[in-house]
Amino acid sequence: MTWLEYHELTKHSAESLRRTQHYLDWANIPNPFRHYEGVRVVDLPVDPPAPQISALEVLGGKTGNTLARDGAEFLSQLMFYSASISASKRVPSSGAIYSLRVNPSSGNLHPTEFHFCTRGLVDWSDGLYHYRPSSHTAEQRAIGDFGTKLINNSAPLIFVLTSIAWREAWKYRDRAYRYCLHDIGHAWQALTLAARSLGSESFAMGHFLDDRVAESCLLSADEWPMLIVGLHGPSIPLNKLNADETVVFGGQPNRLSEEQKTYPLIESIHTATKLSTESTIPSLGEPKASGRGEITLPSHVSASRSFGDVVRTRRSALDFKGGRESISFPQLATLLSATGERLFADFATHRYVHLYL
């Protein structure tokens, strides 16, 4: 299985839409929240203070600051403004209640899970944790220095972003892997921007041995490591490193559905993307320039709401009003400028993604 083969087999067409007889099995919808039974659950401080730096400044690469005094306060701020529940809504027809989160997700299905390793945080045990957004808590799955064992990295805070493909496959079937990658990108940038608003920087790693990371993070078979993000910076409250012995608790992951279906095509493409040896990232050449002319963009807009306010009130656009409520050309120029900011990642040495309007 190659990327091109997967793309051809799962791309939309008039014929594929006509043939489909898929329906949504609401009785078997996957649980959007993973948790682990039999582990210690660590409460994070409620209502953490909002980062006051403007959203546009964060998008432009400027760092904010935090008054967090210990690991719990810093982690609470970081997760509250990157991956927590931001609102709840009720379905008028059924009365069912569903949650919205800070990080966007296609179909609001949230295949991404946030695992993290801590090292040297003030008043916080070194170890492996899983963030539980349903209660804004951290599940302690192991004690010890897992970060350096995981990827030989000395960052005090290392996140492993994973995907549970079944959550997307329930709706999108074989196309689900596309959405898993899409959502990983959303989660990565939500985490990166929240960290920046608190005075920290990040570096993402997509080049790692998948099976080794999955084993080190005690992941179940239905959950795949997709991206590793290390955080560093003077704003992270640190003390001298502990030398705690490694103790593994593990925990039993909850069952997400009564019936969890498998999709061989998704399994095949994921296997094709995995690294099993210490190989290097293939080098890609620069694409040829296209277009017939250049347009000089106007000056950026300066007024902006605070980062904390923006991310907590973000919603998905269901329609576009247009007319007088359309964004201005300077506003568009500001957004375009933000998309050109450098990505700090081991796969960003070449220009893999290009934006066309």
Language model segments and positions:
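N-terminal accessory segments that position/regulate proteins before the catalytic core
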Residues: M1-L357
